[in-house]
Amino acid sequence: MTPPSNSSGTQDTLIWGVRPAHYAMLGVALVTLFRLWYMCRFDLTPDEAYYWVWSKHFALCYRDKGPLVAWTIALGTKLFGDTVFGVRFFAVLLSAGTTFQLFRLAQRLYDDRTALWCFGVGEIIPLLSVGSILMTIDPLSVFFWAWGANLSWQAFETGKMRYWLLLGAVIGLGFLAKFINAVQLVCIALFLCWSRPHRHFLFSRHSLATMLAFGVASFPVFWWNVQTGWLNVQALHDRSGINHSFGIHLNEVLRHLTSQLGVITPLLMIGMVIATVGLWRNQCDQARVKYLLSQFVPIQAMYLLLSLNSRVQPNWIAPSLIAGIVLLVAFWRQFIVRNPKWCWVAWVSLGMGLVVTLALHVAAFFPIPLKYDAFHKAEGWRSFAQHVQQARQQNRTDLLIANYYTQGSMMQFYLPDHPVTYLPPATYGNSQFTLWPGYEVRHGTRALYVVDNKPQLSEKVKDEFNHWRLVDEFWSEFHGRHIEHFFIFLLWND
């Protein structure tokens, strides 16, 4: 890494006669073009297909998540059709936008070269790189978090009301994608409490403007919840594990920590922790360090505490990586200037991140164990749909029923006519499918029931149909590899 500038702001430095911003722009353009090509090399993931089904049922919110992912997919498929490209198009653009916001944040807080290094590190962290081509809630969440981080610093530095209003709107839009984005308001409040020069903003017309803008932007979620009996609260309650008695599960904490080492890579994650502690101890008097710590530590601490009681998914900490990357680069650039012999550690860490990220991208095209294939959930669905379509044609069925939203969503996306699919009847609010009209069984109704793993019928399905038989058992395949085991039953009433 090159030595850092002594300035605390943006500088027009040159690298081989070219500004770092121009290198970053070229890098973003090349990476974006690659991702637009690569994202069509494999099928949708179950969550992507599920959100695509949501996009066909416009609503102000959905049972499991906010509405923005469905709205974004609806726009993508409006432009490019119901295709993998249409579903994922905006994921790639959002990732490019996130990279730009990361670069600008580091540029504002430090200098051009620090910003360029942050761009490079962001591209080789597996969690961010792999997630950049999947149209889930994460590209939206991370983009709006990064934009909010930039806007809040602009708001603090300038005091201009337009930045405070836009900040609230951006955090509100992030909330429409992923509810964790509201925590950014807490992060900002913590910084304002911590930083004496900025403390006057804590209770002011500026912060009030931010809260009002956030309320307006996030209003669809609250209005939908009022109408549906706060289903989002129920879903969050179920996923968090707090509906069970609290207990300390050290194995879950260990699982959480090891998963972070995996999705960030061990050396980069350890380097991030060292940077956090080092800057906290030695440069905590700087407003920019306080700000970055306020954007990084709360999310990490919250999920670490949550892992004591329940399982935490590796991708949940993704928004915190925006500040984490800047902390990492800022600390280690300064440290290596003082201790040049440690330069090899930085290069090994970057090299490991690059190798892991490249390996994850090419793994799907080689016969490796599924547990090492980052995209295995997005493989085999075309062959799955071929088996279902063959069973439909052979048995002349009226309905398609799945035991889980994964199969139901994939059948609806990959079958040629995009038929409406159903899940067995369940309690209202149990899943998004329960909020839509269900199927009706009459005399002579014939249906296919698609299940995974075990050839079992649910009791509710048995109650609705008086005859059933297994008509197909198969493995979905991708490049000659077995991916997942499925069973298709024919159900009928006579």
PLM feature spans:
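Membrane-interface transmembrane helices that cradle and orient dolichyl/undecaprenyl
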Residues: 107-113, 148-164
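Hydrophobic/aromatic-rich transmembrane helices and adjacent perimembrane loops
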Residues: 58, 270, 293, 297, ...
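Transmembrane-lumen/periplasm boundary regions of multi-pass, lipid-linked membrane glycan transferases
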Residues: 173, 184-295, 299-310
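Short acidic/glycine- and proline-prone juxtamembrane loop motifs at membrane-interface regions
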Residues: 127-141
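Transmembrane-helix motifs of polytopic, lipid-linked glycan transferases
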Residues: 89-109, 147, 151
